[in-house]
UniProtKB/Swiss-Prot annotation:
This is Probable bifunctional SAT/APS kinase 1. The active site is at 87 (phosphoserine intermediate). The lineage of its organism: Bacteria, Pseudomonadati, Myxococcota, Polyangia, Polyangiales. GO terms for cellular component: cytoplasm. The keyword Chloroplast does not apply. Gene3D superfamilies: HUPs (3.40.50.620), P-loop containing nucleotide triphosphate hydrolases (3.40.50.300), Sulfate adenylyltransferase (3.10.400.10).
Length: 578
């Protein structure tokens, strides 16, 4: 802190204008500048400090005075208090400014029509319909600040642009020092898990026996394959910091802002969907037995939330589509219409482990990296065989890291994707012949594909952070399907977040190909020549060759890998290849 004195950053603006997002980003950045931060989110304050207050003018003012009082105490202690509350009335905001002194007001300005289009919670629509009275911006006034320190136009500025201007103002005010760029010290160990702690929800020993005795009398929900995969990945810590299926508060914020309620970056909703008639027989506050697809009771849900989501909004925000030609949208619409939320405990793995000789838990991969002395580990996610282009980018990444986690997805995929057993034979052969054995760990990621493109790319990176990776490869159309996403949309998604928020560095690669000009693998950045000098094939072209009993050219795929695919295609009658 520039002077050692505390200060308050007060975010104000209409509901949905981006206050909480910017507040969370600022809270993640200031500790890097030596500033201790305490956050006061308006929604959280109303459920605790201001519980019981309504929305009259008097109650609103009381709520803001309470927030201001706590913020002032935080600032007096030498820390920064970040508040994010609508705080609609100018007079009460100015009262807090006078009382606090070192005060930076940030107005998140956004036109009302934009906010109503963004309205994932449906609050504006309910207010327009008269279901919510005294709703700020509809039938209760919002008084914009006259002279805020910063105005962020959240309808046309990215969160990163807004954050940069807030930080610049804090530097100008002398509240924080300009960011120095010292050489980063060598890490003493692997990157910490997302949220700081590797979750473990498996029960063992006597606790497991007691849980087994209890589940017999519990109502039961049977999981599908995706739900079973999600349960295992919650249990083994791959989805850290999640300890269960999301509640509505986390879900809504993830769908709207790609963040958990805590402000932590998280881009994919992890939910448990059930039919309405099943949900109706379950009581909040009770336990629910979770059964695997084959009927085994494998865990327990502590049910604390139940709600009916707006699946059209979820489809648009998460998948960028509402067309059922998108497999993620099709799955969403076919799943149960009620979501259940709460923490889980696992008795056993929900799915029978495939390929048990390979690590599938974050604790196991982290132990493998530690045993090898690795600190900088790059993760590579794949649901396809590794052809020459993939080999090229993974080896480029190995040049700047200690080791590679080759991490194929072995959960549910769409029709037409290559079966896991065929892909595993390809990986094993390729690693044996073409990679240094001491630089690669082959692990398993037992998740279902969602085909959510840019959002899933962020999600895959955060999960690999939990597995111990410091870097993550993002190629062309990561986690894409069909023509739903642009070629490099997934790479651009990482630009929406600060590196300190993600805690894992994306390695962005352009499409690789065999160049006849340079006689090797290259990209647009490294090889001259037009399309006629490049050897690359689409998935459709590869499938046509394999159906005809022909191998793809060696410039595209290692002959040994191509032979495995040819044998599998001919033997199974599949038209599957990639």
């Amino acid at each position: 802190m520039a002077s050692g004195e505390g200060f308050v950053v007060w975010f104000t603006g209409l509901s949905g204008s981006g206050k909480s997002t910017l507040a969370a980003m600022l809270a993640a950045e200031l500790p890097r500048r030596g500033v201790h931060v305490e956050s006061l989110d308006g929604d959280v304050v109303r459920t605790h400090l201001s519980k019981g207050l309504g929305f009259s003018r008097e109650d609103r003012d009381t709520n803001i005075r309470r927030i201001g009082f706590v913020a002032r105490l935080v600032a007096r202690s030498g820390a920064c208090a970040i508040t994010a509350a609508i705080s609609p009335y100018r007079e009460i905001r100015d009262e807090q400014r006078r009382a606090i002194g070192r005060f930076c007001e940030v107005y998140c300005e956004c036109p009302l029509d934009v906010l109503e289009r963004r309205d994932i919670k449906g609050l504006y629509a309910r207010a327009r319909a008269g279901e919510i009275k005294g709703f700020t911006g509809v039938d209760d006034p919002y008084e914009p600040p006259r002279s805020p320190e910063v105005i962020v136009h959240t309808d046309r500025e990215s969160p990163r642009e807004g954050l940069a201007r807030i930080l610049a103002k804090l530097e100008e005010l002398g509240y924080v020092r300009p960011m120095a760029q010292p050489a980063e010290p060598a890490r003493a160990g692997l990157a910490p898990p997302h949220g700081g702690e590797l979750v473990d929800r498996f029960v063992r020993g006597d606790a497991r026996q007691r849980l087994l005795e209890r589940v017999a009398g519990l109502p039961r929900v049977r999981l599908d394959e995706r739900g079973a995969s999600d349960l295992e990945l919650i249990g083994n810590g791959a989805y850290s910091p999640l300890k269960g299926f999301m509640t509505s508060r986390d879900y809504l914020r993830v769908v709207r802002e790609r963040r958990l309620e805590s402000g932590l970056v998280w881009s994919i909703p992890i939910t448990l969907a059930v039919p309405g008639e099943d949900a109706a027989r379950l009581s909040l506050g009770s336990e629910v037995a979770l059964a695997s697809p084959d009927g085994r009771v494998v865990g327990v849900l502590e049910l604390v939330d139940r709600w009916t989501p707006d699946k059209e909004v979820e489809a648009r925000n998460v998948y960028g589509a509402t067309d059922e030609g998108h497999p993620g949208v099709a799955y969403l619409r076919s799943s149960g219409d009620v979501y259940l939320g709460g923490e889980v405990w696992l008795i056993e793995r929900p799915l029978s482990p495939q390929f048990p000789e390979y690590p599938r838990d974050p604790a196991a991969t982290r132990a493998a990296f530690e045993a090898r002395g690795w600190r900088r580990v790059v993760g590579f996610q794949t649901r396809n065989p590794i052809h020459r282009a993939h080999e090229h980018i993974t080896k480029c990444a190995l040049e700047i890291t200690d080791g590679l986690l080759l991490h194929p997805l072995v959960g549910a995929t769409k029709a037409g994707d290559i079966p896991a057993d065929v892909r595993m034979r390809c990986y094993e052969l390729l690693l044996e012949k073409y990679y240094p054995a001491d630089r690669v760990v082959l692990g398993l990621y037992p998740a279902a594909m969602r085909y959510a493109g840019p959002r899933e790319a962020i999600f895959h990176a955060l999960v690999r952070k939990n597995y111990g990776c410091s870097h993550f490869i993002v190629g062309r159309d990561h986690a894409g399907v069909g023509r739903f996403y642009g070629t490099y949309d997934a790479q651009r998604a990482f630009d929406d977040f600060l590196p300190s928020e993600l805690g894992i560095e994306p390695l962005k690669f352009e499409e690789a190909f065999w160049s006849t000009v340079v006689g090797g693998m290259a990209t647009d950045k490294t090889a001259p020549g037009g399309p006629e000098t490049r050897i690359t094939l689409s998935g459709t072209q590869v499938r046509e060759l394999l159906r005809a009993g022909k191998l793809p050219p060696p410039e595209f795929s290692r002959p040994e890998v191509a032979q495995i695919l040819l044998s599998a295609t001919q033997g199974r009658g599949h038209d599957q290849a990639a």
